[in-house]
Structure formats: structure tokens, C-alpha cells
Swiss-Prot record:
Organism: Geobacter metallireducens (strain ATCC 53774 / DSM 7210 / GS-15)
Other remarks on this protein: During catalysis, the active site Cys acts as a nucleophile attacking the alpha-carbonyl group of tRNA-bound glutamate with the formation of a thioester intermediate between enzyme and glutamate, and the concomitant release of tRNA(Glu). The thioester intermediate is finally reduced by direct hydride transfer from NADPH, to form the product GSA.
Active site: C50 (nucleophile)
Gene it is expressed from: hemA
Binding sites annotated in the UniProt record for substrate: T49, C50, N51, R52, S109, E114, P115, Q116, Q120
Protein name (record): Glutamyl-tRNA reductase
Amino acid sequence: MNIVVVGLSHKTASVDIREKVAFAPTQMEKPLRALLAIEDIAEAVIVSTCNRVEVYISTRDIAGGMARIKRFLADYHGISPEILEPHLYAHHGEAAIRHVFRVASSLDSMVVGEPQILGQIKTAYGYAAEFKTSGIILNRFLHKAFSVAKRVRTETKIASSAVSVSFAAVELARKIFGNLSDKTVMLIGAGEMCELAAKHFINNGVRGVMVTNRTYERAVKLAEEFEGKPVSFDDLFDQLHKADIVLSSTGATQFIIKPKDVEEVIRRRKLKPMFFIDIAVPRDIDPKVNDVENVYLYDMDDLQGVVASNLQQRAEEAKKAEAIIDEEIGQFHKWLSNLEVTPTIVALRSKFEETRKAELEKTLASWKDLPPDGAKRLEALTTAIVNKLLHPPTATLKRVGQGGRTDLYVDALRTLFELQTGESEAEELGELEE
């Protein structure tokens, strides 16, 4: 049995293509059952996020499985195969295992190290388990992917540093103030960057958030998201002294905060330190503000420097993660190969043993003058012959199993000797390997 992965991601398809092939998370039963109804697809899992759509299957027919998934994606979403095909990638065997392990470990994410993708794959697996479209192979495969991702997070620092400007701003604030639990943040602007920064500050336990914007309604809307306080733009400097951290990102063409403004604010704060973060381009805050006593000002260049340094650190950590994945691929591939090989070896030996016993019984029944130890000696002789005959094919199967190329040998033996290997044998092996 083979694992096949077909999909597309932010690396291969624009958002307008990705949204056309996305699956609604609350309506996964229909597509999952449709996949299982397709010829030669034994198990199926669908992962659908804003940045990727992937289908994982187990099948005996690699090329056919890939083609059928591609056709399924096009037909199910009503997209021309000619339009969809250029954006799709397809993997099988070790490449498929590596791909999913990397995805689960966030090495293939838009932001390397982000934690969301692992939860999204777990959710996808949950749907497959609920609707019984995953079985022994994909169950084991995805549980292994989860454990690999955990190892990567535990044994590397891939998720420990900021790689977005908004998160870098929070990281700098923590370096200056340490604990943020008694700090209040003022957001000047209500755009995407301010919203992201607000989320990071809230996640780091700030005491409160104030939001101001030239359009007061937008300030109210963003403040409501974080149980914050909206501030009229006209009241900015009346309220600014209440903020320990000020993050500004507006579309202004001139400075909106100048040194004289901040000097007055600091006096009202009785010289308590303030941290200003200017992520606007053009800048919102006059650089000379940094000269005011007990004021710390950082702009986009400062933050980009933090991000660049952290990206380099993550690149180094990613190398360690790849080494972990290499190690885990070998272990899983061995299990997958043995899943095919072991039941076949058991069935082959059982077939030979049944034949040996049947023929030996016939011989013993018709042998009139059998010596006293004759039956014992014939038992040993026939057993030795069977073992010698079976040693070469058994050794070969085990060897090719370690190399990962088992299907041709397994299929040949099953056909030549008319072997029957039940699903229970495979399940038993799976349980023993857990």
C-alpha cells in the first residue's frame, strides 16, 4: 500500500485559485465519502486551510491514485483540469511522507514556525476519523506526523522568535519593560498592522488597549474586538499619558507626534518610561522624539532588523528540524514496508507448513514398516527442507522492505502462491508497532 499526496499551497497557487478548491470545514463528510467511492482509494484525509488544500490517500495504484485525486478536485469544485493542473503538486512514497512531516512541523508554512498548521491537520484528521475514511495506514501516518511536529518544537527553537513586524514590536516591548501585565497600549490607527499588533499584545497579557483613529467608528470597531477603549483622534494627546506603549500605523503624510507633544506627555507621567513603535511608512513619529528623556522610539528599520535576525535564526533551526524529519521518515518507512512484508511472509510460511503437514500425514499413514523414530526424523527432515526453501524469498523480502520497494515482490509472491493476507494481520502488526 502506498501513501499519495496531491494538493496546492500558497507556493503554487494564488488566493483566487486556493479559494476555489477550498473545502468548508463543517461540510467534510461529502467530499471524504466521495473520495472513498473512487476506485483503488482505500483511505482519505482532506486538509483545507487558507494557505493550502491537500488530499492524503492510501492506494495500491500510485499513478492512478494521483490522476484520480486531480480529477476529483477539478470535478468536485467545477474547475477545468487545464486551469487547476499547473498549480497542483503530487508526491508518493518517501516524498509524500517528507512533505506531510514538513507541513505539520511548519517548515512549509508562509511563516516558518507558526503553530496553526498542526492544529489544522489535527482537525482534518478528526473529520476523517469521525467519518471513518482513515484506516490503519493514514491513522499511523498522521499520528507520526503529530509526534514529529512535537519533536521539532521541543528540540529546536523554530517558533521562539518574532518573524513579523507586529510580533517584533511586542518582542521589543518585552525586552524594555519585561512583564507587560501592568502596561497599557495605545494604538494609533485601526488597520491590519495595528490589529495584528493588538492580538500579539493581548496574547502577552497587557493590562489594556486604547485605540484611536481619524475615523472614530473604526476605532470603536477595533477596540470592541479586544475589549479595549476607543479614543477620539482629537483627544489623542489628552489620553496619551495613560499609555506605556504607543504603536502608530496611519496613512498620514506628515508627523502626527512631535518632540514637544511627547515632552508634555512625559511630564504628566512624572518621567515614567514610554515605548513608541512607528510602523507607518511614511513615518508617523518624528525621529527626534527618541531624544526625549525616558522615551524609546523604534521605527520600521529597527523592527525589520529584528525580523531579519530572527529569520536567520529560524533558518538555522529549520536545518535541525530537517534532520529530525530525516530520522523519523526512516522509522515510518520501515513500519510501512513491514506492514506489507510481514503478513506476506507469515502467509507464505503458513502455506508451506500446511502443505508439509498434509503430505507428511499421508506418508506416515501409508508407511507400514516405519522405524520407531521414523516419524520424528521425517518431521525434522521436512521442516528443514521447508526452512531452506523459504529462506531466500524471506531474506529478500526483508531486504527490499528496508529499501522501501516492496510492492512488486509482495504482489508477485501473493499471485504465484495464491496467498491470502487478512486485514486483521495488518492491524495486529500495527498494534505491535505502536
